[in-house]
């Protein structure tokens, strides 16, 4: 029974990893796009429009929730959702942990509620380099609700927690964003800031 449970756990973990890994190539694609680098070096309005349209098309083809590019201060210079009323364009996301990691050259990973849209998502961030120097950050926002829906259809009792013990995915949506263990006051404060 224990061995079967471990296999099930491993299967769920691989399913989550597989879902997220479908999007990990996208920051590299942005790094290769000349207009993205040009925009980060000189944020001219006409260039911004070209990059917005490029990101919109890439987002549509990849089926991610949103793709956006930030300068090194955390300001969104271009976004795939530029046409939407709740567009990220111009937003200051410097407070986000995924941005802070990526601008330092680390992979940024974060599950949270969007500060602009109020919509949950998994964020993958990557520093965009030019001649060995980070000139901006690419962010891919991914929806993972399809995974939860598959668990529900299969009548599985499953959930995934982040490093703080917060449930970020669950076959029972009412469990989402609840903690599996008590949070310290410091952790609560850090999470509120993020």
PLM feature segments, named:
Residues 38-39, 74-82, 167-171:
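Amphipathic coiled-coil signal-relay and dimerization helices
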Residues 1-42, 54, 62-65, 107:
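Juxtamembrane extracytoplasmic/periplasmic/luminal helical "stalk" adjacent to the first N-terminal
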Residues 50-61, 92-97, 137-192:
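Solvent-exposed, extracytoplasmic
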Residues 9-19, 65-83, 182-192:
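N-terminal short leaders/motifs
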Residues 60-63, 73-150:
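Extracytoplasmic/periplasmic ligand-binding sensor regions of membrane-associated signaling proteins
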Residues 66, 122-125, 157, 164:
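Conserved beta-strand and immediately adjacent loop positions that scaffold enzyme active sites
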